[in-house]
Amino acid sequence: MERPGARRLLSLGLPTVWGAVAITYKLACPLAQEENMGARIVSSAVFFAVGTGLILHVRRALLRELRQMREVAGAAQNVLLRPLPSRVEGLALAAGRLSASRGASVGGDLYEVVATDHGVRVVMGDVRGHGLAAIGTVAAVLGSFREAAHDEPELPLVLRRLERALGRHLRERARAEHPAGGGTPPETPLAEEFVTVLLLEIDGDGGISALNCGHPWPHLLSGTARPLTDGEPLPPLGSFPLPADLPVLGCGRLLPGEALVLHTDGMEDARDVAGTFFPLRAVLAEAARVPPVSPQGLIRAVCTRLLRHTGRLPADDAALLVLRNDRSRIPLQQPEPDRHAPTMSGG
């Protein structure tokens, strides 16, 4: 295995050798001193070869650095937005994402699925913006969720933990970006910084509970595709403080064979050259006609159709998360007028 010190020595030595060859030729070779056409052609060929060698060496060095940066970014992505297991508590899972930046592996979309004593808990969110600032916000929200999902018995308490974690992160960022405040945190976080967040809880009976802060509602696939509910979401986290009362929305039950599709607004907002939005619901309805839906197959189909629709990378990051109920049965409950009718429960 080549050592880093040897690589650095080689990277410095080769340009030095090429430069020494050019200077030696110019100063010591009699042919370089002549003024006739043949001598000039030979001199031009020598310096062209030297220049080409230098360019190729720099190109190889840049490609090597790019590979290393992508490896580091991929490792960071797997830690931050770690790959989901294929199955959690009888639910089949798959997730996919498309970045608005070519070659990028990190962005402002976030998702996680964890099995807890309170049921399977799911988060999907979208940070306003891109780049390193968005990645730091994703880390703050996801880190808080991974702890709060196990610790807190109710979804509203999980959401309040996310709000506090986001507030701390934004205040620390503001203090770091504006150190003139003498170490005193600003009174308000960064302006126009917010995160849309969707929290779901799926219990052992398939019952779905939700809290939504400005995020698109999931689609339920059961022979067709329709929004899980039409309830009014709360404002995104960071834009306004959460209200004192956080009512949990009951969204019916996820029956065996049915699937939920969570997504960020980059899916619905993607447009073609004519400005037509991507028909996400129609694509999902087409996939739902032949149950059971394959989570991985659905991810591939939607991403392929989206790229075909736009003809290029989407203008915004887009993420998709699919959960299919593979449980063999759901315990009997009291009859419900409509198994998917939204109901409100206090939280």
How would you label these PLM feature ranges?
Residues 104, 110-174, 276:
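Primarily the active-site beta-strand->alpha-helix module of PP2C/PPM metal-dependent phosphatases
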Residues 89-97:
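A short, Trp-centered hydrophobic/proline-enriched beta-strand micro-motif
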Residues 78, 99-101:
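Membrane-proximal, non-transmembrane interaction regions of membrane/secretory-pathway proteins
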Residues 87, 103:
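Portal/gating segments that form or line small-molecule/metal binding sites
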Residues 1-74, 78, 82-85, 110-118, ...:
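Conserved subregion of the PPM/PP2C metallophosphatase catalytic domain
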Residues 95, 122-125, 200:
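Preference for bulky hydrophobic residues occupying beta-strand positions
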